[in-house]
Amino acid sequence: MTSDLRVSLPGLELKNPIMPASGCFGFGQEYGRYYDLNLLGAFIIKAATKEPRLGNATPRVAETPSGMLNAIGLQNPGIEAIMAEKLPWLAERYPDLPIIANVAGNTEADYVAVCERISQAPNVHAIELNISCPNVAHGGLEFGTSPEAAATLTKACVAVSQVPVYVKLSPNVTDIRPIAKAVEAAGAAGFSLINTLVGMRIDPKTRQPILANQTGGLSGLAIKPVAIRLVHQVRSISNLPIIGMGGVATAGDALELMAAGANAIAVGTANFSEPFACPNIIKALPDELAKYDLHDFKTFAVNQEVL
């Protein structure tokens, strides 16, 4: 029997559940040299902010066991350049590829302006509201660690967006569930999780942090158990769709996160060590499903009641 990998989410009709995570795939121009991006279920583009950002000082990447730390600082060319150059480039070459726009900012007004503008792009099918970036001085975690602030921002962005808004939740909180409940009540169409965990590395020679920003976001295989736990927790209190991410490098990793409650999967750090990570996972999914006598994702979900 042929496997059916299709997944239907608000604003997104996916041929398969696999997509590159924001910040790990740029705007697709580099990876598009290596394979046809039409193979992907969707594509979460690099964060868009109101003004161009150069990002943090270097060094801003450090290796860790089974992962990496990054403190890029949301470097991007700004919303107007993205609207004028990046999104048209994708639309011309991949007209049927659903694009999810990651949106960030310093203030509520910044987020609202970018959401309103980028949701007008014909190939943007959904927004990923980035309220959980740990590597910027303002915005990000200021919104993502408070249920009230997260709800206020979500409501404002949903009000102006022409496409569904998925809220990217932070793992750097004591309890993720009140924040998930708050943004659901504020109108979120779904969640994406997890963002990176705050970490640090020290150079024993200098006794100083390796990253110029001192701290960075930990990603890669090391965070997979945390991602599984938090996806499972959010699924326990909500029926909204979840785009799960954190430590996914194989089809088995993807299914484990889907068993925890994710409906689709974003692949991040794995793209750096294996540029073909996403198509490799997509190709392996039918055989991985067949191990459990399954041929689609309709019955592949965590067995728990939503409270």
UniProtKB/Swiss-Prot annotation:
The active site is at residue 133. PROSITE patterns: DHODEHASE_1 (PS00911), DHODEHASE_2 (PS00912). The keyword Zinc does not apply. Substrate binds at residues 46, 70-74, 130, 195-196. SUPFAM superfamilies: FMN-linked oxidoreductases. Its cofactor is FMN. Keywords: Cytoplasm, Flavoprotein, FMN, NAD, Oxidoreductase, Pyrimidine biosynthesis. It is found in: Cytoplasm. GO terms for molecular function: dihydroorotate dehydrogenase (NAD+) activity. Pathway: Pyrimidine metabolism; UMP biosynthesis via de novo pathway; orotate from (S)-dihydroorotate (NAD(+) route): step 1/1. Binds 1 FMN per subunit. It catalyses: (S)-dihydroorotate + NAD(+) = orotate + NADH + H(+). Its EC number is 1.3.1.14. Catalyzes the conversion of dihydroorotate to orotate with NAD(+) as electron acceptor. This is Dihydroorotate dehydrogenase B (NAD(+)), catalytic subunit. It comes from Latilactobacillus sakei subsp. sakei (strain 23K) (Lactobacillus sakei subsp. sakei). The lineage of its organism: Bacteria, Bacillati, Bacillota, Bacilli, Lactobacillales.
